[in-house]
Amino acid sequence: MNALSGLRMAQESVGLISVAHQAFVTIAGCGVNALSGLRMAQESVGLISVAHQAFATTAGCGVDALSGLRVARESVGLISVAHQAFVTIAGCGVNALSGLRVAREL
C-alpha cells in the first residue's frame, strides 16, 4: 500500500505551504509505505510545512512512515519538515520519519 506516494511538485514560483496539511493516514499491515517518495523540486520561496499535521498511524512490521521525503533546491529554507507529524507505530522493524532529506538549503 502506498498512501499519497509519488506526489511531485516542480517549479513552484511561490512555494508550497502544506503538502499534506491534514493528511490523515491510518495503516495496518506489513511492508507499508506512508507518504513515501514525496518530492519537491525547485521551490523559489520555500516550504513552510511538508507534513504539518500529517497524522500517520501504522501497525505492523517493516513499516516506513513518511520515508524518502526529499526537498531539493529550496531558495529560502525549510521551516518545518514534519512540524506536527504524529507517528504512532506498533510492530517490529519500524523506521519512522526515515530517510528524511533536505538538500541544498540556502
Curated annotation (Swiss-Prot):
Name recorded for this polypeptide: Putative uncharacterized protein YahH
Organism of this sequence: Escherichia coli (strain K12)
